[in-house]
Amino acid sequence: MSNQKISVGIDDIAIHFPRLYMDMRDFAEMRKANYDKLNKGLGLKAMSIPDVHEDTATMGAMAVMRLIDRNGLDPNKIGRMYLGTESALDGAKPTATYIVDMLTQRYSERYGDDCFQNCDVVDMTFALSLIHI
């Protein structure tokens, strides 16, 4: 048995929320829903709403960009990313494909056109983004 220490855990996390919000009172009124159930029962005060240029792929790309930039990561050295969302863009192509395409455009000038070529991307079906180096 080896005495080598193995480090396991989450080193960093990034989340992107849209900047637009709707007050939960307005939401309840428009949906003819019970505000007290939403506010007191679920603890909701407001709901974020994607702007016209935002979708699950752009929000995921923003979160991953924040992780890469904040930690000074070289995309060529990222071995695996776990990307997930509860809301797919279409039924034919994983959202992770769109995210990696955007990230490649963002980092290709600095790290090369194939900077994510050796990165395995796992598309999950729940809201999560992880990077494994």
Region roles according to the model:
Residues 91-101:
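Short Gly/Thr/Asp-enriched flexible loops that form oxyanion-binding sites at enzyme active sites
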Residues 1-82, 100-108:
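Conserved "HGTGT" condensation-loop signature of ketosynthase/thiolase-family condensing enzymes
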Residues 102, 106-121:
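Active-site metal-coordination/substrate-binding segment of hydrolases
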Residues 51-55, 122-129:
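Short beta->alpha junction loops
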Residues 131-133:
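Conserved small/polar residues in nucleotide/adenosyl-binding loops
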Residues 79-87, 123-125:
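Short glycine-rich or small-residue beta-strand-to-loop segments that form or flank ligand, phosphate
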